[in-house]
């Protein structure tokens, strides 16, 4: 989850998020390269009285400052497109979960084998136990088996919402009448938090997402227990 | 005594020929600095973390700490 005075991304908990982290580093390196160049030139320009009023054109510099930016753009585009297609791969998921956005909670349906469905409301601040996170905890978490490819189908029952979990590198709009599909694998067990990412009314900031990744046997025990309670 | 005629032309060009290579070199140094001080250490950190990562041990530690809701600590 996020922590105070955080500047960068949350630690990656999925291979896709690791790739996104490295791509961001690559793009930021190019940003620093260009910014340093421009800053130096600005300082050099303002700290001189020398001017040349009679320059009309210069083919050489025009070629340089056309070709160089084109090369830089290609250096950014190639890894970007690689990640874009990587994120689109859905390789034989072990489980399909439906996440439905409502005003103002999420509901999850695990219908591959049995009919398991539950709502996930934010735990109000006054009901938090010691150690729980304000505005991030939910009463029922979306439990998934760790290191298993999961397909998630996202939609909404009323207005636009967006299902986002930064540590997993996922953000997908929940659109009424539309099923959006994405997939993820959790690299390690743990609890990963997210928040609704599309303005959806008064309690838009108060419908968090909590994903809990546990080993398969514990996931199976949990789903059996949830089915009994239902 | 006669003085040498001062240079009166090409002053801006001379300044640019001096400063532009420094500008490009500095920007490449900044990019290389970021790459080797941030990007590569981050990649190494992730590789090191997962090289000897024991998911079962970490899961049990987290479980005993009580952070999961689907799995309670073994004492409960």
Curated annotation (Swiss-Prot), chain A:
According to the UniProt entry, what is the EC number of this protein?
Answer: 7.1.1.9
Q: Which UniProt keywords apply?
A: Copper, Electron transport, Magnesium, Membrane, Metal-binding, Mitochondrion, Mitochondrion inner membrane, Respiratory chain, Translocase, Transmembrane, Transmembrane helix, Transport
Q: Which residues bind Mg(2+)?
A: 198
The protein's topology relative to the membrane is: Multi-pass membrane protein
Q: Which reaction equations make up its catalytic activity?
A: 4 Fe(II)-[cytochrome c] + O2 + 8 H(+)(in) = 4 Fe(III)-[cytochrome c] + 2 H2O + 4 H(+)(out)
MF terms in GO: copper ion binding; cytochrome-c oxidase activity
Segments on the Mitochondrial matrix side according to the record's topology features: 46-59
Q: How is the cofactor bound?
A: Binds a dinuclear copper A center per subunit.
User: Where do transmembrane segments lie in this chain?
Assistant: 15-45, 60-87
Major location (coarse): mitochondrion
Q: Which GO terms describe its cellular component?
A: mitochondrial inner membrane; respiratory chain complex IV
Which cofactors must be present for this protein to function? Cu cation
Mitochondrial intermembrane side, ranges: 1-14, 88-230
> Which InterPro entries does this UniProt record tie to the protein?
CcO_II, CcO_II-like_C, CcO_II_C, Copper_CuA, Cupredoxin, Cyt_c_oxidase_su2, Cyt_c_oxidase_su2_TM_dom, Cyt_c_oxidase_su2_TM_sf
Question: Where, in this chain's numbering, is Cu cation A2 bound?
Answer: 196, 198, 200, 204
The biological processes this protein is annotated with in GO are: ATP synthesis coupled electron transport
Query: According to its UniProt record, which protein family does this protein belong to?
Result: Belongs to the cytochrome c oxidase subunit 2 family.
Oligomeric form and interacting partners:
Component of the cytochrome c oxidase (complex IV, CIV), a multisubunit enzyme composed of 14 subunits. The complex is composed of a catalytic core of 3 subunits MT-CO1, MT-CO2 and MT-CO3, encoded in the mitochondrial DNA, and 11 supernumerary subunits COX4I, COX5A, COX5B, COX6A, COX6B, COX6C, COX7A, COX7B, COX7C, COX8 and NDUFA4, which are encoded in the nuclear genome.
State the function annotated in the UniProt record: Component of the cytochrome c oxidase, the last enzyme in the mitochondrial electron transport chain which drives oxidative phosphorylation. The respiratory chain contains 3 multisubunit complexes succinate dehydrogenase (complex II, CII), ubiquinol-cytochrome c oxidoreductase (cytochrome b-c1 complex, complex III, CIII) and cytochrome c oxidase (complex IV, CIV), that cooperate to transfer electrons derived from NADH and succinate to molecular oxygen, creating an electrochemical gradient over the inner membrane that drives transmembrane transport and the ATP synthase.
Report the PANTHER family cross-referenced here.
CYTOCHROME C OXIDASE SUBUNIT 2, CYTOCHROME C OXIDASE, SUBUNIT II
| Protein name (database record) | Cytochrome c oxidase subunit 2
Q: What is the lineage of its organism?
A: Eukaryota, Metazoa, Chordata, Craniata, Vertebrata
């Amino acid at each position: 989850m996020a922590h105070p005075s955080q500047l960068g991304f949350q630690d990656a908990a999925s291979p896709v998020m690791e790739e996104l982290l490295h791509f961001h580093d690559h793009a930021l390196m190019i940003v620093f390269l260009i910014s340093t160049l421009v800053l130096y030139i600005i300082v050099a320009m303002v700290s001189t009285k020398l001017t040349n009023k009679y320059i009309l054109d210069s083919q050489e510099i025009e070629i340089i400052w056309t070709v160089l930016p084109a090369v830089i753009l290609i250096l950014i585009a190639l890894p970007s497109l690689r990640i874009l297609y990587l994120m689109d791969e859905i390789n034989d998921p072990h489980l399909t979960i439906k996440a439905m956005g409502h005003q103002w909670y999420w509901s999850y349906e695990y219908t591959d084998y049995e009919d398991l469905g539950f709502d996930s409301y934010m735990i109000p601040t006054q009901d938090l136990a010691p150690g729980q996170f304000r505005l991030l905890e939910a009463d029922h978490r979306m439990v998934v088996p760790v290191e298993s490819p999961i397909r998630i189908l996202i939609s909404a029952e009323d207005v636009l919402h967006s299902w986002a979990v930064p540590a997993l590198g996922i953000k997908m709009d929940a659109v009424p009448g539309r099923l959006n599909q994405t997939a993820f694998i959790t690299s390690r067990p743990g609890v990963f938090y997210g928040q609704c990412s599309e303005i959806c009314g008064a309690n838009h900031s108060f419908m968090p997402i909590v994903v809990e990744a546990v080993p398969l046997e514990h996931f199976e025990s949990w789903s059996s227990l949830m089915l009994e309670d239902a | 005594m006669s003085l040498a005629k001062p240079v009166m032309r090409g002053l801006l060009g001379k300044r640019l020929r001096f400063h532009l290579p420094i500008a490009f070199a500095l920007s490449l140094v900044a990019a290389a600095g970021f790459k080797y001080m941030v990007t590569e250490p981050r990649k190494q950190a992730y590789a090191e973390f997962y090289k000897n990562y024991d998911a079962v041990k970490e899961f049990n530690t987290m479980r005993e700490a009580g952070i999961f809701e689907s799995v309670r600590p073994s004492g409960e």
